[in-house]
Amino acid sequence: MADSHDAPFRLRSYQAEMVEESMQSNIICVMDTGSGKTHIAIDRTRAELEICRPDKIVWFLAPTVTLCEQQFAVFKSNLPGYGIQLLSGKDNLDHWTDQGVWDDVLLNIRIVLSTHQVLLDALSHGFVKMRNLSLLIFDEAHHCSLKHPAHRIMSDFYKPRIGTELPRILGLSASPIKTAKVTSEDLQQIERNLCATVKTPKLHRSELLRYVHRPHLMRIDYPVEPQDLQSNMLSFLKSAYTNYDLQKDPWVSELLQQRQQGHDVTKNIHKVFIGGKTYCRDQLRSLALKAEAMSQELGMSVMDWYLRGCITQFSKMVHMSDSQLLDWSADEKRHLLEILRTLPSIDLNSHDIPPMSLGSMSHKLQLLIKFLVAEAKHDPEFTCLVFVEQRVWVACIAEVLAIHPETRDLLRVGTFVGESENSKRKANIASISEPRNQQATLENFRAGKLNLILATSVLEEGIDVSSCHLVVCFESPKNLKSFVQRRGRARKEESKYVIFVPQAGRRRDPESWQSLEEGMKAAYLDDLRQVKLATEKEQQSETGHRNFEVKSTGALLTLDNASQHLHHFCSILGAGPYIDNRPQFEFTEIRPGVITARVILPLTVDPEVRTACALDTWATEKMAKQDAAFEAYKALYVAGLVNDNLLPARQEADDELSELQIPDHRPSLVPVSPTLDPWPLFARHQQQNPHVYYRTRLTLHTVDDKPKHLILLTPKILPDIPELLLYWNSSTKLKIESSWLHDVVLNDEEISELKSVTYKILYSVFHNRMELNRRDFVWLVAPCDESGLLDSRIWLSEWRQHTCLATELIAQNSDWSLWGLVNQKGDARKYTPRSTSMNNQLWLLQLMQLPKRRDFLHPVLESANINDAYTKTDEMAAKDCIVDPVPAPYSVFALLLPSILHRFGMAIIAETLRTTLLGPVALDSAHSLLLTRALKSSAADGNDNYQRLEFLGDCILKFIATVHLMAANPKWPESHLTAKKGRIVSNGFLARATIAAGLDRFMITKSFTGAKWAPRYAGDLLAETGPAVKEERSSKLIADIIESLIGACYTVGGFEKAVLCVQTLLPLEPWISVPAANSILHEAAPAEADLMGLDVLETLIGYTFKKKPLLLEALTHASFSGPHVHCSYERLEFLGDAVLDYIISKRLHAHSPELSHQKMHAIRTATVNASFLAFRLFETTIDEETINKTSMRPESQKRAIWQFLRSGSPSLNANRDNALRQHEQVRDEIIIGLNEAARFPWHLFALTDPPKFLSDMVESVIGAVYIDSLGDILTCEAIVRRLGILDCLDHILCNGVDCLHPKERLGHLAVDKGVQYARVGMNTEPNEGDKMYKCQVKVGGEDVGDVAEGLKRLNAETVAAWKAVGVLESRKDSAIEIVSDVEEFFDADDGGGISLDDP
């Protein structure tokens, strides 16, 4: 079978054809060695296990134990999710005499690999039944003939049961016939034996020939060694055998002694003397024959070394009582050793084998050395496989090459001779010098540590050997099968296949072998002549004319440019390290000279347009290919995957919006309208209805005093605002309650009086910022009682016109609670009176200082050094104090009015937005506060701003966009969906939409300070008629407002309101509601009823699929080309990413107490990053019980989702296994870090580098469950919890785990010092050749922490940052300070935050 370590592959179309043929009927797949039969077996097995019942078994049969062992490893690597068992004679199967033992060993086993004899015996004894098997795979199927166990399996147990429940048959072979005399009857016999039909990929023969490189066949003639040359040692050995005295043989002596003792051994004695066979004599004969053959093949000096080695090793084993000689009697060992002592040049006193002499090597061996040296020197990438007939010759040639001066430093030699013969027989002295089998030889050869393997025929059939550029047959192949199999090992381009041929030999010339092979293949594949003819026809001139024009643009598709267009389309579908996105073409010769073609596009393309056929027939493949490409590309255009310019579909920006030239990639400053000023509208209403006023009662609650009331009159009704909290100082808070009163109609006199009262109240505090005697206020204020009635004390006659001394008021016995603000003579500071007292005939005032602050909306930080003077009572002499005329409580109200009116102003903006732009969303007035929060940037309010809602809205928009695009574009590949979604949620697109809708007018971007506050006058507001001056704002901030409003609408009414908001603010896209999209996606999903083998997977996931193909699609990598495939998982991963993000973000936003947006971003990044998801994928397992075939004790096998990934890339499997090793190395540390550490263990995850497809699997499974459950988020949450993600999130939230990334934390610790990650050298570590990235953190130019290393740059920088953080935090002066007063926050998708993917 083909080696599985070749370059990454996409199952070639001829391989896919063979799998499909096998799904339909029993076949014998005949393809050249190296053409990928292993991949066919793997995909056919996977397909069978997906559709058969869970109690069925796939049984793979191979002719040798070595081949079984190799394929066992291949199956385990490619199908790790299924129980796999290897059975061989090593397992002492002859002791398994009870059905219970077999039942135990096969418990939860889905794939068995064994030799044919193992299955035959199991069937013969009834331990295994044919009805229990679902698929029988016969590797090297040409063995199924005569009395071979493969044939007996079929003749004794399969054919008699035809008509009952039987397994499918798949035969694999490169040579269906083992002999040179091939007839049609021979082929038919093999087909009859296997109840199958010989199939070869006739449809794709041209492709097959492209991938299978036939080597250049050459011969090396060598002279046969003279027969009369003899060495003294060999002559003595042959003489010892010829003149062997049977009377002295220990076995004969024992028989004669038994006869003397009365035992009836006459028959045995007669047999010995007639046949002359005893064990000692047979050993001499075997040694002499092997030595004589070796002298002919390798030469006298090599033969002498071999004999000395065998005899010396035998002597050593006798003296050490080696276990290999346990079956020998002591007399036999001594007797044979004494005979061998008589050989010349043998010194049995030394146990060291004398060195070999190179003086008398055979001409054949010398030619081999000369040829190998020449080839190795010519080709720096020399790799060679030398087939040698006998095992002992392998050892001898290896020794020659190891010591020969021309080869010892040039060739790196390994040996491979497979398993020894029956290990239960007595040791053979002639085989003592055989090389022991070295399994590491193959691994070292693949790794390049060896460049030449000396092997016996065991490497002919199926053993996984990397492709060689040179294959040498030291002896001519014994049969056609050997010739074909060995030739298949030379699979590199420009490779050579060399056969040594004796000049006087009788064996066939290699050219005749090739001729016979072609004749044999013609019996079942009569296409070689057609291929040759097709090659000639390809060189002929053929033209075609067909056009397709897009009327709107004039873009023209022709037969000549279609292939180029199609290749470009496929190239941008999304590249990957394991994926070949090129279109594949198949050609079919309908009749001689008439060809048609079919093209197959990558798996990411929708099935409806994935294939296309040529419209016409052609004489050449070139034109058929162009025709198929033309039809394919036209179909892509019709499906909307190609635009009117005949380019891959791209969403053009709206012309009107694109004129704004706002880039999509990063924040930039763009001109926007200033924030809506609500008061001019009030002035116009006042002008139109001067006597109508709407009343709002304001109530001030303080800690010590009783509530104070003020009525606010406005020409338009004010929106209702909730209780307003004002900050008097760092410890004292004031509350303002507002309530609506019925509107009133005032006469001119009442209005005039109210304006005067308003003027007096405001003037008491803001006299420096008011125009003298100007009273055209747009709103009015006046004292009122609890019911809202105007206080009688408002009449001007009751209020003094001027200030007066405090002593005068005391003398008048005036109530101090009605006094105005107090100040000392010559001091502008104002105080509120608290009480009066007499001390030593001196009146004293207890006063509390009035704050100079004008902003009471924001808390006063302790660090601001605001003392407690605003609540502490000071004492002053009354004679030094001046009292203002307006009662102090109303002056305090006036001091608070700017803050109150600012809050009302923001509420008016939000209410205006609610009733205008957001009118279609139908929000209630009660939601104005939420809208206000959604409109405020962090610069406007550092505590209560849009950022939490933006965090939620960003996620909601991406979710809505994802499900909408999936439903609206069912044929779009993931790359198109990702590009379109990226444009919809990009800063540029959202900023353009914000400006186009006029939403920028509602953004509140400036923080209230009150420092320059002054009352607004109606005359000024009405006079403002010029165009508003544009302001520059960040496009990110503008875009965030849409997301925050979406978040607010979702908070109010879930996805229904959120989608209405999206439809309103982003009207260019024809949005589909979430429920409608869910229905569309569910209905579009394929539903097949014959997938019965997914029980383990569904148990792992914790969900039973109604449409099971969705589950297979979620686990199908784009490199897969097997059966039962709808699409690869990219679209589901695209959806699952949004679903997972939504589940996490929703829980974070709903958490109580509320989390800051920085914490939410950090936690979400931690719980959805690729390393964490891959970790959870590895950790999510179930136990499956199996029985250890050696100890017969139960064992628990871990089954995991990742084991069921359907891919077609060996390199993907290698990277998966590497990620699993990394996981196992750090698993315990990560678990402790996740469960016990106060900080998320970013630095431990940085020690792993899982490939993206692992985290993709998590998201694709979630996406599949979402579609299958019709968008049931609770079901999806259950899956996310099953994967351990939500449990980790709960732990983080419950224990306050800090998830800030070390690189971000280091930036905070560094404050204003620059942070650099300086790369240190470029070292290649010896461990698997991984290139490790090393870096050193520098803070302010100083090295901090140790040098850190990682598999990639980001990994190394993360570990380095973690180390540096530890150093800085250990210093006394370090303190982390997270800056939160920035105007906007960047998340990872928008270019900010921490991205965990190495760029």
Swiss-Prot record:
It holds the Pfam family Dicer_dimer. Residues 897-1054, 1094-1270 form the RNase III domain. Residues 562-656 form the Dicer dsRNA-binding fold domain. Belongs to the helicase family. Dicer subfamily. Residues 364-549 form the Helicase C-terminal domain. Residues 18-194 form the Helicase ATP-binding domain. Its cofactor is Mg(2+); Mn(2+). Keywords: Antiviral defense, Antiviral protein, ATP-binding, Helicase, Hydrolase, Magnesium, Manganese, Metal-binding, Nucleotide-binding, Repeat, RNA-binding. One of its GO terms (cellular component) is cytoplasm. This is Dicer-like protein 2. A motif (DEAH box) lies at residues 139-142. The record marks K1252 as: Important for activity. Residues 1301-1370 form the DRBM domain. One of its GO terms (biological process) is defense response to virus. ATP binds at M31, D32, T33, G34, S35, G36, K37, T38. It is an enzyme of class 3 (hydrolase). Its EC number is 3.1.26.-, 3.6.4.-. Dicer-like endonuclease involved in cleaving double-stranded RNA in the RNA interference (RNAi) pathway. Produces 21 to 25 bp dsRNAs (siRNAs) which target the selective destruction of homologous RNAs leading to sequence-specific suppression of gene expression, called post-transcriptional gene silencing (PTGS). Part of a broad host defense response against viral infection and transposons. Mg(2+) binds at E1133, D1256, E1259. It comes from the Eukaryota. PROSITE patterns: DICER_DSRBF, HELICASE_ATP_BIND_1, HELICASE_CTER, RNASE_3_1, RNASE_3_2. GO terms for molecular function: ATP binding; helicase activity; metal ion binding; ribonuclease III activity; RNA binding.
